Amino acid sequence: MNLTEKWKDLLEAEGADMPEIATATKQKIMSKIFENQDRDINNDPMYRDPQLVEAFNAGLNEAVVNGDHGYDPANIAQGVTTGAVTNIGPTVMGMVRRAIPQLIAFDIAGVQPMTGPTSQVFTLRSVYGKDPLTGAEAFHPTRQADASFSGQAAASTIADFPTTGAATDGTPYKAEVTTSGGDVSMRYFLALGAVTLAVAGQMTATEYTDGVAGGLLVEIDAGMATSQAELQENFNGSSNNEWNEMSFRIDKQVVEAKSRQLKAQYSIELAQDLRAVHGLDADAELSGILANEVMVELNREIVNLVNSQAQIGKSGWTQGAGAAGVFDFSDAVDVKGARWAGEAYKALLIQIEKEANEIGRQTGRGNGNFIIASRNVVSALSMTDTLVGPAAQGMQDGSMNTDTNQTVFAGVLGGRFKVYIDQYAVNDYFTVGFKGSTEMDAGVFYSPYVPLTPLRGSDSKNFQPVIGFKTRYGVQVNPFADPTASATKVGNGAPVAASMGKNAYFRRVFVKGL
């Protein structure tokens, strides 16, 4: 029996506060999370601690039928029990069932549960040449393929493009060209006129544009002559004409589980008075507070991780004019001389579209398909029409949700972008990101290990009760996220300072004057 079948009843359980687990992928992920939680329940005696059972039994008595002999999804959904509770595992499982599926990580990050305290990520990279550590990466989305690599011998006689005096007699030259977006690729040229480079063998975007647009350069690629191909690899007495080679390497990164934990201590007097006056159970109330706080903080960590990893938007290919990283409604350049608010809002949509396209160009996986934004930006998107007249507003007819007391999911923009509200944003901004159809196709990964572990004890000095909750999980950055690190060996996948602002799966733009 696979895990999805094993946990089918719990996955499909319905209740007032039970979020739907609709897709097969999400059900598969949640079944692994349930299995990790179940393993912890069975192995840790804490779940059968009499004091903890007593504390949970009063206010969180969902769980089991006839004691602790199995899970009843209907009871878990309704929060009831029909037998003596001797194991709080099902209670905790119910909390996991309600809380984990609502994490924003399922929408903006890849979710890959861990089966142990450490996991590994393996990355295969194809490279040019014999040395897999120093060779330039092949099949890179932002680097043009070396289109003459297979068309020449390893001991190539094509010279680097000189700084001045390039021959115009049909002699080919090669140079590494850096585009305006910062991409570097090897290209081959014929000089038709005088071309000057600042550095031999290296061509800037301006030098390339001036040369090609001015008719001084043409880009060429070709295979080798048959006579040359026949004499490769020392055939018929020839020498120094080996075949060009390609190789690959496999990079390994380690993901380690980290923890979040909170505790709460209260007096016996508080518990007694709370029960007598309000009919509330202190353990139940504090347990809910602690568990919810852990989940809220985890949600916030994922949003902050995405924003900190995001590249500066409105830069490179997406800048055009105006200040980098900022879309200013009061700047006529940014809004393209808009006359009315509707036209200005459309300019914002165009900028979002450009950022989404840039994500697709750099990742080679797909254009951006979700947006995280402040409330004001979401409101602006809600009042913008991309299809009707130039000044029309109301593409969504105001139907986008901007009330985070309901949900942080605002709606779908133009049938393409899922929009989420950052309810804690301190300034207006939007982040465009991409998540593919699989959990491996994302810029960052959330890897839950043990979702929730309850703890209870008494202070050894004052004998007052103490309760706590712990969660364990890992966070990982996609090893292909930095498009500039294609040739270097990636050894650390943790979200360290060196990786901030370089993740091609996300692009962030601040919004002014809204």
From Swiss-Prot:
Post-translational modification: A proteolytic cleavage by the prohead core protein protease gives rise to the mature major capsid protein during virus maturation.
Organism name: Vibrio phage KVP40 (isolate Vibrio parahaemolyticus/Japan/Matsuzaki/1991) (KVP40)
Statement: the UniProt record of this protein carries the keyword Acetylation: no
Keywords associated with the record: Capsid protein, Late protein, Virion
Site positions (Cleavage): E62, A63
TM spans (from-to): none
One cellular component term from this protein's GO annotations in UniProt: viral capsid
Protein name: Major capsid protein
Record carries keyword Repeat: no
Classification of source organism: Viruses, Duplodnaviria, Heunggongvirae, Uroviricota, Caudoviricetes
Similarity annotation: Belongs to the T4 phage capsid protein family.
Subunit field text: Homohexamer. Interacts with the portal protein. Interacts with the capsid vertex protein that forms pentamers.
Function: Major capsid protein that self-associates to form hexamers, building most of the capsid in association with pentons made of the capsid vertex protein and one dodecamer of the portal protein.
